[in-house]
Amino acid sequence: MRALLPTVQETKGSWVGWTGERDGQSEVVHADGIDLYPVPISSQEVDRYYEGFSNGTLWPLYHDAIRESNYRSDEWDSYVDVNQRFAIQIANIAPPHAAVWVHDYHLQLVPNLLRELRNDLRIGWFNHIPFPPLELFQRLPWRSEIIRGLLGADVLGFQRRQGADNFVSAAEHLLDATELDNGLVHFEGRNVNVGAYPISIDVGDFELQASGRAARQRTAQIRSRLGDPEVILLGVDRLDYTKGIGNRLRAFGELLDQGRLDPERHVMVQVATPTREGVEQYQDERREIEQIVGEINGRHSRLGFPVIHYLYQSLPLEELIPLYRAGDVMLVTPFRDGMNLVAKEYVAAHVDGDGVLVLSEFTGAADELGEALLVNPHDDHALQDTIVRAVEMHRHERRPRMEAMRKRLETSTVSDWANSFLDVLIDR
């Protein structure tokens, strides 16, 4: 939402989406300078379409999560119904020959459904999460239907080249589509542009807020309240089993047990934003994480000074930016992630040019932020060693790394991302 809002405002576009509420409103709302067209989703559809097929089937499959996906026909039927409802709403409000940008794995059937309703439209689709290799995608009983749904678009965008290649492989294998030159895929008389468009953030806004007096004062206050430790390690994630929070916490605990980190000098702050709280897998993940936090704090905390400060809450940007600035070492270690904008937000917030980013090699951000300390989060020893290296890194190494990442971000903003995609779409 934060990444897309400036683009919709700048293009004077309309937003079609779900409010996030069961049996929510359907009245048009004008807010933040744009028209919002809600698509109502019933309580049963939330269970089947959203929590069921989208997040119980597609999410773990696309992230290659080590857990079984659900393959239920009633949930697939609900997925089809909701995608059809979105397509109808878009078809009803889109001006002639408008550009329509569909987002994410929840709406993979919309491009072709919309094409059947409004062939005059220029349709783009962007995937915010990984797209899996063929050997994983083939497990899905409705694999061909999803590929056909996506091939209704004019432009298909993925976070990484790897995701785009995986899609092309699936389209060739499952529907006999043909890969042409210049990123085109030919299918049933049409050419579809397939490419990598790595998403970014509003770098200027982050830098402006991070440079402000309020952010500086709040950063100092955070450090003081944490006991002015020598090093603050920071994790900011949605509470999701793909984010590797448990592995990260265990690595920190092991380093304390081994004496490689000192609880009087090194503290950790872990923010876990609530998400999908009605899904059992996420409830289990929360319990496991909170148990790990309790065990480590029980072993290593002093009275009034926990070694891990754990927040299960969503923080506003005005609180998050000072927290980023306070973090000396940022730990972004998901098992797999389409991009991970937290890594970019941390870099943008460090207007002082200091700080160390520890980054999973299985994120899209790793393609762009090569000066981070890249790590395989599945390798416990490598993760521990990388954390220690980050903590001990001298400023003469820290600052050039951070400066290089900051310069790259400044030439790859959210506006650059949106414009690169929309330019291709509008030129079709």
Labelled PLM ranges:
Residues 1-428:
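Catalytic cores of carbohydrate-active enzymes across secretory and cytosolic contexts
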